[in-house]
Amino acid sequence: MRITHISDTHNKHNHLTNDLPGGDILIHSGDFTSIGRESEVRNFINWLKLRTNYTHKIFIAGNHDITFQSEKLFRLKSEWFDRKVYSDEGALGRPEWLEEILKNELDESIIYLENSSVEIGRLM
């Protein structure tokens, strides 16, 4: 089984396109965005969909992907940016657009893990 691991791409994942060897599993272990904007998340998901040289693509959110972490969203936006980047509704839970992406826009080859696991072949 061939596994490729990347992380901390901070919206620069497009620069890796020609450098990834392909294989069975691509794992991105967080910080695929700079601050978790909707446009950043959508761009990353679309990039994952185009990685057809991998059978499975697994990703988790990192500390920069703050819209995935609703409990931190309100506090971090004021600490990091000293201004409002998101509406206060994000502090009450994940933004609706993110829930919609995770529920409806991931194809069968893309797996998002949060407090969970996945078994692929004999690997877990």
For the regions a language model picked out, list residue spans one by one:
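Extreme N-terminal starter segment of soluble prokaryotic enzymes
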Residues: 1-3
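Core catalytic region of metal-dependent phosphoesterases/phosphodiesterases
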Residues: 6-121
